[in-house]
Regions:
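Beta-propeller-forming repeat regions
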Residues: 1-174
Length: 174
């Protein structure tokens, strides 16, 4: 096991590392056990990630079934999602707000998404709509999406909030 974070980030969070390891080379060639000691690691909290995919949970008579969203939904992190029937077929669709421009320096920007509309198939599976069909195409650092009737006409608009960017609002074609 090796450290996940780089030396710069780690020593800012834990200043003792700078004195203990002194150089980037020493940090890079160390294992977690040599940095933190086996006893410290044994005492530490441990978390396990079972999936990183964007998913939905379907309630099947008291237990939940995890269903991963299509590959297009996995292109970038999503900090916001909204359920709305965008095509008036009686089935809820999903809108995702994609991208993350400010992770840790050593991770780099996660900016491969344009946000995404997923058409519900009625069985907790979803089909991605091309951006040319949905009209949704946002290359910014979106943080939230909400469906809200902004003009009082009974039809919900889809509003995207961006980090350090303008709000973008989409309306249904009439």
């Amino acid at each position: 096991i090796v450290p996940r974070r780089g030396f710069s980030c780690s020593q800012l969070a834990m200043p003792f590392l700078k004195d203990k390891l002194k150089t980037f080379h020493n940090f890079a060639s160390s294992t977690l056990e040599t940095i933190y000691t086996p006893s410290r690691l044994a005492e530490s909290k441990k978390y396990e990630v079972n999936t990183l995919e964007h998913s939905v949970l379907m309630n099947e008579a008291g237990h939940f079934k995890l269903i991963n969203l299509p590959r297009e939904a996995q292109i970038a992190p999503s900090f916001g999602s909204e359920l709305i029937d965008i095509d008036d077929d009686g089935v809820l669709d999903i809108i995702l707000a994609h991208n993350f421009f400010s992770p840790q320096r050593e991770t780099g920007r996660m900016d491969g998404g344009l946000s995404l509309a997923l058409k519900g198939n009625g069985d907790c599976t979803y089909t991605p709509l091309p951006h040319s069909v949905s009209g949704i195409s946002i290359s910014g650092d979106t943080r939230r999406v909400i469906a809200i009737d902004l003009d009082g006409n009974g039809i919900k608009e889809i509003a995207f909030a961006q980090n350090n960017g303008p709000m973008i609002i989409y309306s249904k074609k009439r």
